[in-house]
Amino acid sequence: MHEVKKVVLAYSGGLDTSVILKWLQDTYQCEVVTFTADIGQGEEVEPARKKALALGIKPENIFIDDLREEFVRDFVFPMFRANAVYEGEYLLGTSIARPLIAKRQIEIANMVGAEAVSHGATGKGNDQVRFELGYYALKPEVKVIAPWREWDLLSREKLLAYAETHGIDISKRKSGASPYSMDANLLHISYEGLALENPAAEPEEDMWLWSNSPEAAPDEAEYIELEYSQGDIVAVNGMAMSPAQVLTRLNQLGGKHGIGRLDIVENRYVGMKSRGCYETPGGTIMLKAHRAIESITLDREVAHLKDELMPKYAKLIYTGYWWAPERRMLQAMIDESQKTVNGWVRLKLYKGNVIVVGRESKTDSLFDPAIATFDEDGGAYNHADAAGFIRLNALRMRIAANARQRRG
């Protein structure tokens, strides 16, 4: 166990990773480097520095990085160019954050000369797969330490007892029952555990932190306009914004109007079904708007091909294959399709609904009113051409019908 000299730990400052930090020191007798990512989880990250210092980590071995812009620009936006949705509903808020954390962890390991990395994902979940596939894709020889697969601290009570024995601050946990297991970033917040483990039980209203209920949302609709450049939102209501600013603003607007709540049972990669609740207000708006601008700027067959490939792309992200060659290949194709996705979309937000009320692309629209009109089109479309088109497309079915008749 003592062959590891230095390990980079993905460290949140919470109970689990604080226990892991101490456990790594005691079990591996190694130097621990902590890495805390700010990806918009809404919590102060500086307390993680204080906790790490209190647990004996050298100041130069504490890394706290603001990755919000990189997260949205290089991970969230590319995913939304694909309209990625897992199993018809899940917008992949947790899944898409893991490859960025893994990437930065490996970068730090290379900087400090660490031969190992560690994470706090449990042995039952998807995150262990997502983290470790990323590690191995970016640093094939790295040693991965996954404490939840090694130690015997397999209950919350054992973790708390270990923390108290080793003087780890657990003040946030002393007030009573454990809270829901939550994970947050700029794209979403998720809730699991406790009463949610009964899929028949409706979540309590006070569980939801980011959004009003549709019933409590404003009675007056709000209109917004999003501007697109090559498939990405670059302005909200005429105001140019960075990627992280765009998502932050859309989260505010969506949460205000009760948009983006989701309660699903999903199929985990490790084989079990799991119930989770999610709030993705900004992402829900983005998905609806992106499909709207694509509807007038993408060729029909390109749009249909994207829709056919999207479930595969979404599954790759869900199961941790962001860094795999097949995901890169699909991304290159998707990004090629987005070169013409320019223009604006107008939306109405009202009590949990995102309603498209207008879309326009002055440079790349494939919508031709002269051809699409139900009125006189001046000869732009010859109705007589449809007869031959229909007969040719019906040919195989006519042949099959004749064969059935011959068989009797």
From Swiss-Prot:
Its main location: cytoplasm. One of its GO terms (molecular function) is argininosuccinate synthase activity. InterPro entries: Arginosuc_syn_C, Arginosuc_syn_N, Arginosuc_synth, Arginosuc_synth_CS, Arginosuc_synth_type_1_subfam, AS_cat/multimer_dom_body, Rossmann-like_a/b/a_fold. ATP binds at A10, Y11, S12, G13, G14, L15, D16, T17, S18, A37, G120. One of its GO terms (biological process) is argininosuccinate metabolic process. Pathway: Amino-acid biosynthesis; L-arginine biosynthesis; L-arginine from L-ornithine and carbamoyl phosphate: step 2/3. GO terms for cellular component: cytoplasm. Keywords: Amino-acid biosynthesis, Arginine biosynthesis, ATP-binding, Cytoplasm, Ligase, Nucleotide-binding. It is an enzyme of class 6 (ligase). It is found in: Cytoplasm. Homotetramer. Belongs to the argininosuccinate synthase family. Type 1 subfamily. This is Argininosuccinate synthase. It comes from Laribacter hongkongensis (strain HLHK9). The gene is argG.
